[in-house]
From Swiss-Prot:
It catalyses: a (3R)-hydroxyacyl-[ACP] = a (2E)-enoyl-[ACP] + H2O. Signal peptide: none annotated. Pfam families: FabA. One of its GO terms (cellular component) is cytoplasm. It is found in: Cytoplasm. The keyword rRNA-binding does not apply. GO terms for biological process: fatty acid biosynthetic process; lipid A biosynthetic process. The active site is at H57. One of its GO terms (molecular function) is (3R)-hydroxyacyl-[acyl-carrier-protein] dehydratase activity. It comes from Cereibacter sphaeroides (strain ATCC 17025 / ATH 2.4.3) (Rhodobacter sphaeroides). The keyword Cytoplasm applies. This is 3-hydroxyacyl-[acyl-carrier-protein] dehydratase FabZ. Belongs to the thioester dehydratase family. FabZ subfamily.
Amino acid sequence: MTEAAEATLSADIQLIQRIIPHRYPFLLVDRVRDIVPNQSAVGIKCVTMNEPQFTGHFPGLPIFPGVQIIEAMAQTAAVLVGVSLDLADKGAKVYFMGIDGAKFRRKVVPGDVLEMTVTVKRGGGKVWKFEGRASVDGELAAEAEFAAMLDIPKG
């Protein structure tokens, strides 16, 4: 596949659910686009007032929790790994292992479309390292480096 063709890969919600085990209310990525296997991807999260976390974070002032932005980046990275290694329907899991340098730059609120760009810093084996940046309308909302472990069941 050419580099230009690879850049057009995407994952809709059906494929995402075939790759990662997360479900409502903890499935935090709606679509993944611009997938370049083993390199990068962009996750999309459409933030709505219907998010269950807004009941308590915060009543009358709904703000999408920063830790869930980081989790959305991690889920985007897991989909990138799944597409890169053709893991749909194989029961593989990508476990979040650690996070470094997390910074939150702006509030994310209902109506925002969160774009999470994840880039592979190291991958291909059991342990993958990523750099993630989340933005809304081109404005940086959060950034972090994080690691994940790939677990593929035998059989």
